[in-house]
Amino acid sequence: HGQKNGLMTEMGYNWRMPQLSAILGRYQLKRLDGFIERRNEIASKYAEAFKDIKEIELIKVPSYITHGYWKYPILLKKYTAKEFQTLLKEKYNIDTGTVYYPPVHLQPYYKENYGYEEGMMPSSEKNLIREICLPIFVDITDEQLNYVIESVKAELS
């Protein structure tokens, strides 16, 4: 409800969870600490690998926070997100994502109902056009992770 082709066209969302999803969720909660630990491990490897690459701006997480790393966003300086996503997919067969695009204030619902328009939130617009999310999931193998790291480094170093 509320989405059409990934764009928010009306307010609302259907949050009713099917029973099978609830059962799976309860089971997965028992493994949550392990999931978070693995995602932090992956994020640390990305951060270490990319810390000296000037074409990448990494997210900064305060040391007192345990991040869940639902996604691993990086900001690109040389490419737009779309350009780099296409490059990684076509040349290396690596799928990447975004956090949110377009930014919330440029979603049709907010533009039509609240009068938001391009240019009103320049930082969001500037960042989201250059932001991609690298693969981060608990079952990624070290071999796959190293392949992503080496592929990104090959293009941005």
Language model: regions and residue ranges:
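PLP-dependent aminotransferase class I/II
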Residues: 1-157
